[in-house]
Amino acid sequence: MHPEPSPVGTLLRYFSWPELRHHGLRHATAVLAVLLGVALAFSVHLINESALSEFSSAVRSVNGQADLSLRAAHGGFDEALYPGVARHPDVALASPVVEVSTLAIGPHGQKHSLKVIGLDPLVAAPLAPALIPHLAQGEDRLMLFATEAISLNAQARQKLGVEAGDTIEVQSGLALKKLRVVGTVIAGGEALGVMDIAGAQTVLGTLGQLSRIELKLVGGAQSAQVLQALQLPEGVVSDSGDESTQRVSNVSRAYRVNLTVLALVALFTGAFLVFSILSLSVAKRQQALALLGVLGLSARERLVLVLCESAAIGLLGSVLGIATGTGLAYTALKLLAGDLGGGYFPGIAPTLQWSPWAATAYGGLGVLAAVLGGWLPARAAKDLPPAQALKGLGDTHRASRMPWLGPVLLLLGVALALLPPVAGVPLWAYLSVACLLMGGIACVPGAVGLLLHLCPMPNSPAPLLAFERARRMRHTATVAIAGVVASLSLSVALTVMVASFRGSVTAWLDVVLPADLYARATSASSSGDALNLGQDLLDDVRHVPGVQRAVGIRVSSLSLSRSLGDVALLSRPLGQAERSLPLVGDLLPAQSGRVSIYVSEAMVDLHGAAPGQTLALPLRAGQPPVQAFVRGVWRDYARQQGAIVIDQADYQRLTGDQAVNDLALWLAPEARTPDVQSAIRRAAEARGLASGLIEFAEPRQIRETTLRIFDRSFAVTYWLQAVAIGIGLFGTAASFSAQVLARRKEFGLLSHLGFTHRQVLGIVGGEGLVLTGIGALLGLGLGLAVSVVLVEVVNPQSFHWTMDLLAPWDRLGLLCLGVVLAGTLTALVAGRQAIGRDAVMAVKEDW
């Protein structure tokens, strides 16, 4: 005999589909929640993969086929190193390179950052064919070696609006040097131009210096052995294109993982919405499901039927989410150029890299979230007693068989929060947050019973009934307020985290911006190598009327590890470090005869530079590293890979570098800022400099700009808070509606006992007030616990900085009050729909 086919497929068509059509808006909301979660997570993945792919391609086009790249750990190195490297028997080809990031101005005034690469076209051709200029028609071949000739890639030509034969200006300090566009290069990525190496050194002021040497080794030569034989001078390190890509991937990993987790939060709340929608659906179809059970549909088939409904919601939401995520990623790549708002891929314009495997994986996450959300309603349908349910007496919500689960999950969440990160990602902290959320929700029935037991018993009949039902049927509260607890706790946690971060950044800005006015050379990038205001201009500024004090600041990059990104080295007059730096912890006394430095928190985590330790600084190629003493740690929210502050006198003595990137100016009380700015521009013009390249900013402007960027970066969290609260309230509405509809006989009996409609409605509203009030209280407490993990664990492990925990009680109070009012109103609306003649007549159904 052949086994009978399962009736689930037929029931999906004739039983489930009409329900879906009849309540299309309700189910569409669940589909929308899954859609949003999948779309956000998939778009973050696409943006990052596309940006990384484009960055890798750009690195390969610049580095070409080189096996090794030699560069200075800080600044450049003497070109005298090149001949010895080129003559080594294991080196087949050695190409010297000068590379400077600067500002370019097109013929029509367009400004854009430009990477200028100087190389020897005859030597570099086999190594980096993408960087070899293709001269425009009519140009003499000798223009390849002309001092003031440059060839631009497509990105540079587009941004500057130039063609062959046009003239552009590039910035060198506060001077503008004219260059003629003579050809093109096919290299992709950010805007760049290629010059003959001698011309680049002359124009950009790097005579006698090289940025790097690209090496092609002979067949069979091993990189490690060649490096050992070369005996490179101190401060010169080796690198490869793959290592550069891996460094950027490592730096951006924490940022993109956090964005992905935020996106999965939407999926988490979407699962609760599916749970609430299907709970309502099962409650409304309780008698129909019972009839199907009497007619032969097994408990297992009822379980499968509801799970198939949840999977259908997840599948539709996932398919639409993948399409929406693709559109979001495409739009973001056009508007943000793959930057993700974190500044990790500056200057590149990636194309969308769509992956069917990634689409399948993220779509599967959406289906899985929906199925998990439908599991409890499916179990309720499976455990339905058909005989009782046909009479409307079935209870779809039973007491938990595992009362210990909630406390165990909470304890597990606390334990996981104490574990270190995994490969730089706070994996255990994320699992801790998940355990805290699930454990808190599992504790809802017990917490409701405990809180109601502690509350005084009301005397009036209606409040007494509302109070007693909430206490005695508290296991139904898990369904009624689980959405409120989940969504409110997430919203509270995000609110506290963002408020803590914003408050800490504001306090940090107050310390690091003590001057009245700041000046710098104009550029699209704050770290451009050619941005040098010059020591002479600084001396002139100190004599400008209205300037009481002028301090020059030098910012440069320093490589301390091949696997980690470069750290920022800040040289400035320090004086009393405890007053000029936002220190964290105690400041150790300086050691006589040793250079003192002050490191950011990231330096402690990434490089082990704790106070009292000695850190080797390769400040000058060809000289031994400086053994610097770490006096203290300071808070820095601007440089995720770490920063070091060194006194300017020590820096200039050790490096001979007199350059200045920024000026900090303290003005006299009677001085007018516009007059001081004009006087500084005149001083620059008197030295033959381009005064228009100087930009000024007051601390207020810098603070406003920084906080505006901060708010824009966290816009997605504000949006997720709104989504979470909306989904939670919708789930509460669905749960209350399900319970009220299942209690029509109870309301009818109360009416027969003499309760008026208003009193019965008051009972329903009272239950809603009690349950949502308790839900808000639990959500607030759980959210504060989660926020502690986010602030004290996730942020330090992800970005290597700490912040002060700040709870905005006014906003949190309004948030909880709004949830309680909305939940109570929802219960009243649901009660009005269930109370009436139908409720009175429902009592006769058993007679």
Predicted regions and their residues:
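Alpha-helical transmembrane segments
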Residues: 26-27, 38-64, 256, 279, ...
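Small-residue-rich transmembrane alpha-helices
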Residues: 276-278, 312-344, 357-383, 409-422, ...
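Alpha-helical transmembrane segments, especially those used as permease/efflux helices
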Residues: 1-5, 9-10, 17, 21-29, ...
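Hydrophobic, regular-secondary-structure patches
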Residues: 26-115, 140-143, 158, 224-228, ...
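Small-residue transmembrane helix packing/gating motifs
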Residues: 62, 144, 184-219, 512, ...
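Short beta-strand boundary microenvironments
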Residues: 114-159, 527, 535-614, 627-633
